[in-house]
UniProtKB/Swiss-Prot annotation:
Cell compartments where the protein resides: Bacterial flagellum basal body
Gene this protein is translated from: fliE
Natural source organism: Listeria monocytogenes serovar 1/2a (strain ATCC BAA-679 / EGD-e)
Family label: Belongs to the FliE family.
Name of protein: Flagellar hook-basal body complex protein FliE
Keyword list, A-Z: Bacterial flagellum
Amino acid sequence: MAIESINAASVLPKVTLGETAKTDNAAGAGNTFTQMLDSMSDTQSNAQTSVSNLLTTGEGNASDVLIQMKKAESEMKTAAVIRDNVIESYKQLLNMQV
């Protein structure tokens, strides 16, 4: 069994000086955040509908409604933490000296 040498120039990507990073990742992160907010909105509306149905018509199970409410609450808390982190990062950017 022979060991072949590896040509690093052919394996590694070619990077030139002054090349900037692609901004596709930033757009992807924005889309991911938007999808998370849409999902959170759907969860909130489903929880509200479940509570309304349980109270008005008696449809549904109380434990399932409680689980949906807790899930909606946890998603709301997560969104609030992300919002707070974004605001804090923005404030730090404003305070940076150029």
